[in-house]
Structures are given as C-alpha cells and as structure tokens.
Amino acid sequence: MLPPALNIPKWLEANSHLLQPPVNNYCVYHPSSPATAGYTVMIVGGPNARTDYHINTTPEFFYQYRGSMLLKTVDTSVSPPVFQDIPIHEGSIFLLPANTPHCPVRFKDTVGVVMEQPRAEGAVDQMRWYCRGCGEIVWEKQFVCTDLGTQVKEVVEEFGADQEKRTCKACGTIAETRFKEGEIVQPPRFVE
C-alpha cells in the first residue's frame, strides 16, 4: 500500500525541531524506502549560513515553501569560474544542473523542499570551500554519499576544526565556515 501524502504545514507543526544546524534538514523520503524509487526528499529550514559548496552528480530540485533563500552557485565550465547568486522566492522552484557547485543560504523562518535523484553506484559527492579573497579552491573533500545529513556535518566540522585546511594556498586568506551576521542579504519573499 502506498503511504499517504505528506502535509507540509502539519509536518512542520510536529517536526520543525528536527531542522537543526549545521545541516538544518530532515529526510522525509529516504532513498532506501521502496516507494521512493531511490529519490531523496528533504525538508530544509533556516537559518543556515554555511560557506561550503556541495557538488552532486545528479540534478537537485528546489521548491521554496516559505520565505526566500539564496542559492550561491559556481559555473565551472568557464575559466575563470563565474560565481552567481540565484534568489529562490516563496512559491518558486529551481532545477540545479548536475555537478554544479552550490551553497544554499537559508534565512530565519524559511522552509524549502529539496529533491535529489538517485546517485549511481559509487558516485562521488564533493564539499568545497572557495577563497572569498581570490576565488581559488581552499579545500575540498570527496565522499560516496550514503547519508547526506551526517556526512555533510562531519565534513563541515572537519574543515572548521583545522585552520591549515581553511587557509588559502594562493593568497593566505583564512576561510570561515559561516557567513557573518548580515553579510548576506535575504532576497524579497516574493518575486517583485
């Protein structure tokens, strides 16, 4: 028998406490569940101001349920890479192409839904930090994704605990693990 539809407002009423830093997400449909055909569906809350960029071998679908978010991306198909901020407003959707470095910045009292396709067996995810001084890669780690929530947290904590990993080899700038308060401006809630 198929499970019932998930009512987002009711789910949030009962479970919003599960959306905790540093990842702020909860997997409502896990890829190992038979009914999901391998898809991962997460409810993600704010605030989340991590500076890492995630690289996934499959596209990611974003639906912004409440409030607005900013999806920081890097186009690595050109040289030098181009940094682009994509606002995703309440009620909006966005499909991020596979292998696009992205840093989702979520603000207080915002909620979104993210859906990921099944990864190929042995597919490698990456977490990457870029230098905010010169744009070079400061540090990155590759891993086979089996549990996004716990693995991302572990990589973020590993990076944050090691100043050598956080130091840019090109210019010496020390990368932070979080944006400073007020450094990122929240896009308008709705499309203007």
UniProtKB/Swiss-Prot annotation:
Binding site for Fe cation: H54, E60, H102
Gene Ontology terms: cellular component: cytoplasm
Positions with a binding annotation for substrate: E60, R106, E116
Catalysed conversion reaction: 3-hydroxyanthranilate + O2 = (2Z,4Z)-2-amino-3-carboxymuconate 6-semialdehyde
Subcellular location: Cytoplasm
Record bears the keyword Oxidoreductase: yes
Enzyme class: oxidoreductase
Pfam families assigned: 3-HAO
GO biological process, one term: L-tryptophan catabolic process
Binding locations of a divalent metal cation: C131, C134, C168, C171
InterPro entries attached to this UniProt entry: 3hydroanth_dOase, RmlC-like_jellyroll, RmlC_Cupin_sf
Pathway linked to the protein: Cofactor biosynthesis; NAD(+) biosynthesis; quinolinate from L-kynurenine: step 3/3
Enzyme Commission identifier(s): 1.13.11.6
GO molecular function, one term: ferrous iron binding
The entry's keywords: Cytoplasm, Dioxygenase, Iron, Metal-binding, Oxidoreductase, Pyridine nucleotide biosynthesis
Principal cellular location given in the protein's record: cytoplasm
Binding residues annotated for O2, in chain numbering: R50
Recorded family membership: Belongs to the 3-HAO family.
Record PANTHER family: 3-HYDROXYANTHRANILATE 3,4-DIOXYGENASE
The name this protein goes by in its record: 3-hydroxyanthranilate 3,4-dioxygenase 1
Gene that specifies this protein: bna1-1
